[in-house]
A protein has these predicted regions:
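Membrane-proximal intracellular helices of multi-pass ion channels
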Residues: 1-449
Length: 449
């Protein structure tokens, strides 16, 4: 009996597939062959790392380079890759390549796992998603070797390049440089821009790249790009530009971050941190020394996340845009919610509000819980940590290893919740049919708001 033949809802299959990979991953990471000579990690640390990697977050209690051997780090790469594309996606790919036909439930599971709203060209889509991932990660690794091979030698340099390329494209934020992350390359344009490009491409979503392939590369029709693709590209450009500018403004005179850097390096760091803050988790500055207003800006950026259908977390930029557009139409008294010569349907609006509402409630619940378990930590750093976990970003103000075990358990739960998605989690827990009474439509009424 295969996994896809088990009688579960699509949401339940996705949730259990992630739990399965986390369990197997934590066991593999705890094996003696996976341990570095200097490792002092316990199974709890391995479990935390497995959750963070499968949920492509980037938080850790023990640094990868100091904890795992080369074999262990290869396991880490596999966990990040499977987490980024989901186990369901891999099973679906092998099933399709083997010529196996899928019933409606199996296809629905694959659609939900890869955030694909329709089945048109779905077989081509899933194959293209994996081919695109392999091609971009390989290209990114090749570019990074020009920096890492001179720094670490051929063997370690190539391995580090592959590790970071996979981590960046999957928006995981893990590196094997130690607790300082990539701070040593804060002024290196090759490393920063390559990682930023990988993060952006992974965060745009496979639907966007499939649209590019079918409309531009194959037909040369830019104007025929899907509405979703145009929206994602436009909003991504706006958010990255605004975030870079805000970081420049708030950190311009801060000597502990970018204050002492020349202008072009300030611009590079501000751009890179804006890119990584949306969902990747790499750090080229020390967040404990950043201005509080900068941390608040970053918390907002983490909440927004990237585009659906990719490796990014957060509520997704399309959901945020939908909420803003709907609020605008209500304020102006407009009958429809329009954008770029399109009217957004009510089901999309309802899903956007539901996603945001559940995300916000979980964030507040997680923040309340961790304030109770780790009351000695600064509130702004706890907010930063909770949002980083829930939005699967992975940045931290050096807080994760110092949290209590209860606090780390809360962070693990938030990472899992954020990776699966608020609505998918709730749907997987609610496996009941709507009663006749719940399905009734009563007379319309109103209440004061």
């Amino acid at each position: 009996m295969s996994f896809l033949s088990i009688k579960l809802t699509p949401s339940q299959r996705i949730m259990f597939s992630f739990l399965f990979v986390i369990l197997v991953g934590s066991i593999l990471l705890s094996l003696p062959i996976s341990q570095a000579d200097s490792s002092v990690a316990t199974y709890w640390d391995h479990l935390f790392t497995a959750v963070s990697m499968v949920c492509v977050t980037g938080l850790f209690t023990q640094a990868v380079s100091e904890t795992y051997s080369i074999f262990g780090q290869i396991i880490c790469i596999l966990l990040i890759q499977v987490g980024g594309l989901s186990l369901i996606g891999f099973i679906g790919l092998f099933a399709l390549r083997g010529g196996r036909k899928m019933d409606f439930m199996n296809m629905a599971t694959l659609q939900e796992a890869l955030s694909r709203s329709d089945t048109k060209y779905f077989r081509s889509f899933i194959k293209s998603a994996f081919a695109f991932t392999l091609a971009i990660e390989s290209l990114g690794a090749l570019i990074l070797t020009f920096q890492f091979v001179p720094d670490f030698g051929w063997q370690q340099g190539i391995f580090n390049s592959i590790f970071l390329a996979v981590s960046a494209f999957c928006n995981a934020g893990f590196d094997n440089f130690g607790a300082t992350s990539i701070v040593r390359y804060v002024d290196n344009p090759l490393v920063n821009l390559t990682l930023a490009a990988l993060i952006i491409m992974g965060g745009l979503g496979f639907s966007v790249w499939f649209d590019f392939q079918t409309q531009i590369l194959s037909r040369g029709h830019f104007k025929k790009l899907r509405f979703h693709t145009k929206v994602v590209l436009a909003i991504t450009a706006i958010i990255l530009s605004a975030g870079t500018l805000l970081t420049l403004i708030t950190e311009w005179k801060n000597p502990d971050t970018i204050g002492n850097l020349p202008f072009w390096e300030k611009l590079l760091v501000s751009f890179f941190q804006t890119v990584t803050m949306r969902t990747a988790g790499f750090a080229s500055i020390d967040f404990t020394k950043a201005e509080p207003v900068t941390l608040l800006i970053y918390i907002f950026q983490m909440m927004l996340g990237g585009a659906p259908g990719g490796t990014a977390g957060g509520i997704k930029i399309t959901a945020f845009l939908t909420i803003i557009l709907y609020a605008r139409s209500e304020i102006l008294g407009l009958p429809n919610t329009n954008f770029m010569s399109h009217t957004i349907d009510i089901l999309t609006i309802r899903k956007a509000f539901a996603t945001f509402s559940v995300f916000l409630m979980v964030f507040l619940a997680g923040l309340f819980a961790i304030v109770v378990t780790d009351a000695d930590k600064p509130l702004i750093f706890l907010m930063f940590e909770v949002m980083s976990a829930l939005a699967t970003v992975g940045v931290t103000a050096n807080l994760t290893p110092t949290l209590s075990m209860a606090g780390q358990a809360i962070i693990m739960a938030l990472m899992f919740f954020g990776r699966i998605g608020p609505l998918s989690i709730l749907a997987s827990l609610s496996n009941r049919k709507i009663s006749k009474k719940e399905g009734l439509k009563y007379a319309k009424s109103s209440m004061l708001v």
